[in-house]
């Protein structure tokens, strides 16, 4: 069965990279190859290097990209290893970098992966299925304080203490639907009627399992060092906490180093642009509604 995944903010992301036919481009979250395939179509003598810690994504994108060309390399790795992995290819600078921080549709839709709170499966949520830490371990062994911390820090979960307490009391919890019911049991009916709390709690557990925020911060530093002059780093985010990491990192780079009242003209090193999905894209793909594309371009 073919895995359907619609790349989000595709046109805006590709345009922002200003692709040169002989350039070197990175897709640090190759996924199902939606964005990567459009990059590869524009490369004549250039090279696309794609990263993903999900081996299934690597295999699926390879099939898709092979139909377009052969000038690509796929690396099964977390993007926080990007500099080391590129060094193995003797690459120390690139012409553009794309990062899509969203979880892909096939990952959500495949019940066995344990990401979905509406489909029953063993608690898993690992992007890299070779790693030991999974959602089952987090849910069944973390202390109440540890659970409260990840719920609040990674998803701003309302009633985080009550949810953590409910999880502790109902252990062992083995499946996604069991966890969903436990989460709901911590909320009064009035709050449940307004919003399903499972989305935020599952998000927090997924971020913990995959060490996502730490990886993002490491990746940002490495990506910045890899950019050539006049090249761009384009990052698509899907929730406010994730986006705030990117916004803060980019903001610090473009912020003036001098007091505002000092009449010193600074040479701009970077510019930042922000894009949101069009109404048309949102109507065609509801998953795009919370997406945001931030693009940092290195000027000197």
Curated annotation (Swiss-Prot):
Record GO terms (molecular function): rRNA (cytosine-N4-)-methyltransferase activity
Catalyzed reactions per annotation: cytidine(1402) in 16S rRNA + S-adenosyl-L-methionine = N(4)-methylcytidine(1402) in 16S rRNA + S-adenosyl-L-homocysteine + H(+)
One GO term of the biological process aspect: rRNA base methylation
Chief location: cytoplasm
Enzyme Commission (EC) number: 2.1.1.199
Signal peptide: none
Domain of life per record: Bacteria
Binding-site positions, S-adenosyl-L-methionine: 33-35, 52, 79, 100, 107
Compartments reported by the entry: Cytoplasm
CC per GO annotation: cytoplasm
Keywords, ordered alphabetically: Cytoplasm, Methyltransferase, rRNA processing, S-adenosyl-L-methionine, Transferase
Described function: Specifically methylates the N4 position of cytidine in position 1402 (C1402) of 16S rRNA.
Family label: Belongs to the methyltransferase superfamily. RsmH family.
Name the UniProt record assigns to this protein: Ribosomal RNA small subunit methyltransferase H
Organism, scientific name: Mycoplasmopsis agalactiae (strain NCTC 10123 / CIP 59.7 / PG2) (Mycoplasma agalactiae)
